[in-house]
């Protein structure tokens, strides 16, 4: 017999109670024959979930909630098995109350979370911190040092350094090494740099050496003229000799 798919009416519930009292809560097919439009399965579920006088309709206690959570961790969503540990509770009752507990805990967690900082805000803040660290790391790599100086920065003769570089005494390195704090003693270990300007040493070396030699010759000539300029002229007032034209140095 086809069952009608609708809510149970109060008259049907009263008829079901009378039939269960007459036939007992076992022979559901015989009971369904007395209820037009209801199947044996529908009668059984209606009885055990709603009409059975043994059903415990009291609210779940804290002890029952703890037992329900522990049973669910063991048996999962097997509600009919879990209901056996709760006399007077139906499988629908334990299932519905488990969902009530989960919803309540979710509301409690949402209250503890700071306002305006949900999951997306946390991920965004973490991403910003990660990007800052990456940028800082790139900045440190970009500031790796430059030329192989065998002396301290405070005593650099820039012209002499450039001259030694062009004559081959100082060379460039194309590799970079991140700076480690406290690992480099600038007074003992040379520093490194990039050849950003890409100087053409073959075309400029002779010009610079020639200019250097010219500067050195001018310095020598200047030094030779200084003693003569500093000489004090001597006048022979007594006409002793031809010293009037000579200076006293």
Swiss-Prot record:
Tissue: Expressed in stamen. Present in roots and siliques, and, at low levels, in leaves and flowers. Expressed in stems, especially in fibers and, at lower levels, in xylems.
GO BP, sorted A to Z: cell wall organization; negative regulation of secondary cell wall biogenesis; plant-type secondary cell wall biogenesis; positive regulation of secondary cell wall biogenesis; regulation of secondary cell wall biogenesis; response to abscisic acid; response to salt; response to water deprivation
Subcellular localization, as worded in the UniProt entry: Nucleus
Main localisation: nucleus
HTH myb-type domain sequence ranges: 1-55, 56-106
CDD domains: SANT
Ranges of the DNA-binding region feature: 28-51, 79-102
Protein name: Transcription factor MYB52
Gene3D superfamilies (UniProt xref): Homeodomain-like
Coiled-coil parts of chain: none
GO MF annotation list: DNA-binding transcription factor activity; transcription cis-regulatory region binding
Gene Ontology CC: nucleus
Keyword GTP-binding attributed: no
Top-level taxonomy: Eukaryota, Viridiplantae, Streptophyta, Embryophyta, Tracheophyta
UniProt xrefs under InterPro entries: Homeodomain-like_sf (IPR009057), Myb_dom (IPR017930), MYB_TF (IPR050560), SANT/Myb (IPR001005)
Up-regulation conditions: By abscisic acid. Accumulates in response to salt. Triggered by MYB46 and MYB83 in the regulation of secondary cell wall biosynthesis.
Keywords: Cell wall biogenesis/degradation, DNA-binding, Nucleus, Repeat, Stress response, Transcription, Transcription regulation
Disruption-associated phenotype: Secondary cell wall (SCW) defects including severe reduction in SCW thickening in both interfascicular fibers and xylary fibers of inflorescence stems. Hyperlignified SCW in interfascicular fibers and xylary fibers.
Job of this protein: Transcription factor that confers sensitivity to abscisic acid (ABA) and salt, but tolerance to drought. Regulates secondary cell wall (SCW) biosynthesis, especially in interfascicular and xylary fibers.
């Amino acid at each position: 017999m086809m069952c009608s798919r609708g809510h149970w009416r109060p008259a049907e519930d009263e008829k079901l109670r009378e039939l269960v009292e007459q036939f007992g809560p076992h022979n559901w097919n015989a009971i369904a024959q007395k209820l037009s439009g209801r199947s044996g399965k529908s009668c059984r579920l209606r009885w055990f979930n709603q009409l059975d006088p043994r059903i415990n309709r009291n609210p779940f206690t804290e002890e029952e909630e703890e037992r329900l959570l522990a049973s669910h961790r063991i048996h999962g969503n097997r509600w009919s098995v879990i209901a056996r540990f709760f006399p007077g509770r139906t499988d629908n009752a334990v299932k519905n109350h488990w969902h009530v507990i989960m919803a309540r805990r979710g509301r409690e967690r949402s209250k503890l979370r700071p306002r305006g900082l949900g999951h997306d805000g946390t991920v965004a803040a973490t991403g910003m911190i990660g990007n800052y660290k990456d940028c800082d790391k790139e900045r440190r790599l970009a500031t790796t040092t430059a030329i192989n100086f065998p002396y301290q920065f405070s005593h650099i003769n820039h012209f002499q350094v450039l001259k030694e570089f062009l004559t081959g005494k100082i060379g460039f390195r194309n590799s970079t090494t991140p700076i480690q704090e406290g690992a480099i003693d600038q007074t003992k270990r040379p520093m490194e740099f990039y050849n950003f300007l890409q100087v053409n040493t073959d075309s400029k070396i002779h010009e610079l050496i020639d200019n250097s030699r010219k500067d050195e010759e001018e310095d020598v000539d200047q030094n030779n003229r200084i003693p003569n300029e500093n000489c004090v002229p001597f006048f022979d007032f007594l006409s002793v000799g031809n010293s009037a034209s000579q200076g006293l140095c």
